[in-house]
Swiss-Prot record:
Belongs to the prefoldin subunit alpha family. The keyword Cytoplasm applies. SUPFAM superfamilies: Prefoldin. Keywords: Chaperone, Cytoplasm. This is Prefoldin subunit alpha. Heterohexamer of two alpha and four beta subunits. GO terms for molecular function: unfolded protein binding. CDD domains: Prefoldin_alpha_GimC. InterPro entries: PFD_alpha_archaea, Prefoldin, Prefoldin_subunit_alpha. The keyword S-adenosyl-L-methionine does not apply. One of its GO terms (biological process) is protein folding.
Length: 139
């Protein structure tokens, strides 16, 4: 009987660990999904041909203060990693962002697959715990 309790405790520990992994994956998926949404909006802006011409608008510079600004859509300053930025033509920026979107989608799909496998294993563990509990109650 003591062996069953230890085995049950181990199963519960494994289930709790898997649950924390699932929660972690959910958090990463949510974060990547938010990034994906922002990148899609940016790509839509870059592809918007109606606003090819320079456009005057107001941008917030902080503390509720705005400044008039002009956006020219022929070149953009783009982060390339490690705090490094480069100036790039519009079409190259669109291509780069499209590639990033594909990578983000691939990452989200991989994480969803990992999550599905973990959830299946988690559910099997819960069934084993329930089965063990039923056996202990019948003893």
């Amino acid at each position: 009987m003591a062996g069953n309790n230890i085995s049950g405790e181990e199963l519960i520990e494994q289930a709790n660990y898997m649950k924390s992994l699932i929660d972690s994956l959910n958090s990463r998926i949510a974060s990547l999904s938010a990034t994906l949404s922002e990148a899609n909006q940016t790509l839509s802006f870059l592809k918007d041909n109606e606003s090819d011409n320079s456009k005057q608008l107001r941008i917030m510079i902080g503390s509720g203060i705005y400044a008039d600004a002009t956006i020219k859509k022929d070149k953009f300053i783009v982060p390339v990693g490690s705090g490094v930025f480069i100036e790039e033509e519009r079409e190259r920026t669109i291509k780069r962002l499209s590639e990033n979107l594909k990578d983000l989608n691939d990452s989200i799909n991989r994480l969803n697959q990992q999550k599905k496998e973990l959830e299946n294993n988690y559910n099997m563990l819960l069934m084993q715990i329930q089965e063990l509990d039923n056996n202990v109650r019948q003893s």
